[in-house]
């Protein structure tokens, strides 16, 4: 699970490298899992980025280090915590997604992210 102030990798080509979670949409609890929409603060970005350091954006969690339990009893776990920055219509701001994403995004209607991802686990 991702908590408040957790530093996450950004898995798209918006130019942001690291982002910190500052809130979760629609919930009082301060934790987030795969497929949750969160608000992030950009901690580190490249010089020619479309999003700059210090900006606040919405993002969706695509990978977590904490295991995700599936209906068949199996668990899925990634090596890093990662997010994809999204616009107000829940479409990704970038045009590429780096690394695998969880299949649970399909159930939460993030089809554009699923189609851009190189691998869906």
Swiss-Prot record:
Molecular function as annotated in GO: large ribosomal subunit rRNA binding; structural constituent of ribosome
GO terms for cellular component: cytosolic large ribosomal subunit
Coiled coil spans: none
Assigned keywords, A-Z: Ribonucleoprotein, Ribosomal protein, RNA-binding, rRNA-binding
Gene3D superfamilies: Ribosomal protein L14
Cell wall biogenesis/degradation among keywords: no
Single biological process term from Gene Ontology: translation
Record InterPro entries: Ribosomal_uL14 (IPR000218), Ribosomal_uL14_bac-type (IPR005745), Ribosomal_uL14_CS (IPR019972), Ribosomal_uL14_sf (IPR036853)
Name of a matching Pfam family: Ribosomal_L14
PROSITE patterns in the cross-refs: RIBOSOMAL_L14
Subunit: Part of the 50S ribosomal subunit. Forms a cluster with proteins L3 and L19. In the 70S ribosome, L14 and L19 interact and together make contacts with the 16S rRNA in bridges B5 and B8.
PANTHER family linked: 50S/60S RIBOSOMAL PROTEIN L14/L23, LARGE RIBOSOMAL SUBUNIT PROTEIN UL14M
Function description: Binds to 23S rRNA. Forms part of two intersubunit bridges in the 70S ribosome.
Family designation: Belongs to the universal ribosomal protein uL14 family.
Protein name (record): Large ribosomal subunit protein uL14
Gene: rplN
């Amino acid at each position: 699970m991702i908590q408040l102030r957790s530093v996450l990798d950004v898995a798209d080509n918006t130019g942001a490298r690291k982002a910190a979670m500052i809130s979760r949409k629609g919930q009082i609890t301060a934790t987030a899992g795969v497929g949750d929409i969160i608000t992030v603060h950009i901690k580190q970005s490249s010089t020619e980025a479309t999003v700059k350091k210090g900006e606040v954006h919405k993002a969706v969690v695509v990978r977590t280090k904490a295991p995700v339990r599936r209906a068949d009893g199996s668990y899925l776990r990634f090596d890093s915590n990662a997010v994809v920055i999204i616009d107000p219509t829940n479409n990704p701001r970038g045009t590429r997604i780096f690394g695998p994403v969880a299949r649970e995004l399909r159930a939460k209607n993030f089809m554009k992210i699923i189609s851009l991802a190189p691998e869906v686990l």
